Regions:
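Extracellular/lumenal and peripheral-membrane lipid-interaction modules
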Residues: 1-267
Length: 267
């Protein structure tokens, strides 16, 4: 579902392009036009292309109100393609690609009587999210290093090694060499991430072990953040374009890049 932040649902091609572009710009910081739409006979659409390349997304977007009351058929679209190369999500660069075929879209309104676009069904499609292990390692150094410096701790070295534990599970070993004044410590962090049968992504294990007083201090300091992370989860159904679509399968693969692939559709 995509909130359009307007009272009336678009009734022709130009209005729909404008509404979609304005709506997506509320969630993605990016200059220029995001949406391209091709249609020979509206409301039958040949292609909706969404270009998020180089955009910036808040890691905690505001929750979206569901549609309430009456809904109806808005249009049908042969293909919806989304490209998100070097898309920054919470400061972490990712590559995102999504393809949907034979999509049926409905109109509706939320509790504020603003129009919403509901992607009701798709015959088939897939979403692929990728990130290189090296880029993830650099992001951890940048983000965690900034927080560590608040405690007077410098990260001298950090190494990330990820591996798949199965089709829906992956593990990460993070080895850190830290320094505070003249004290040094080696800190090992283990993270396990699992995806449930309900397509909910959750950190199931998060452990820290450090040597010496500095290592113990770091692990103790991290415990509240670890506990908050263990309590959080992310449903793939909360992704606006997938909230109403039938999800079929998902798997993770790890090599030089970490790839998450979601298969969906009624086919």
């Amino acid at each position: 579902m995509i909130p359009l932040f307007r009272r009336l649902f678009p009734s022709h091609k130009a209005d729909l392009i404008e509404a979609l572009d304005e709506a997506l710009h509320r969630f993605v910081e990016k200059p220029g036009t995001i949406v391209d739409l091709r249609s020979r006979v509206f409301p039958y659409i040949d292609l909706i292309a969404i270009n998020l390349d180089g955009g910036i997304v808040d890691s905690s977007p505001p929750p979206m109100a569901p549609a309430e009351g009456e809904t109806g058929r808005a249009f049908e679209c042969a293909n919806i393609n989304v490209s998100g190369r070097r898309l920054s999500v919470g400061g972490v660069p990712l590559d995102l690609r999504m393809e949907m075929r034979d999509v049926v879209c409905d109109w509706g309104h939320d509790a504020n009587q603003d129009a919403v676009l509901i992607l009701r069904s798709a015959r088939e499609g897939q979403l692929v999210i990728s990130a290189s292990q090296l880029v993830l390692e650099e992001s951890i150094v940048r983000i965690v290093g900034a927080k560590a410096r608040l405690y007077g701790i410098e990260l001298e070295r950090l190494r990330l090694a990820m591996r798949a534990r199965g089709r829906r599970s992956l593990a990460a070993d993070i080895s850190v060499q830290a320094k505070k004044f003249f004290a040094r410590a080696k800190i090992d962090i283990y993270v396990q991430l699992d995806i449930t049968n309900e397509y909910v992504v959750k950190i199931s294990q998060l452990k820290c072990k450090g040597d010496g007083k500095l290592g113990s201090f770091v692990c103790t300091t991290l415990q509240p953040a670890f506990q908050r992370a263990l309590e959080k989860s992310f449903s793939l159904r909360s992704i606006p374009l997938l909230s109403e679509i039938q999800l079929r399968d998902i798997h993770v693969a790890v090599a030089d890049t970490v790839d998450l692939t979601v298969y969906f559709g009624s086919a």
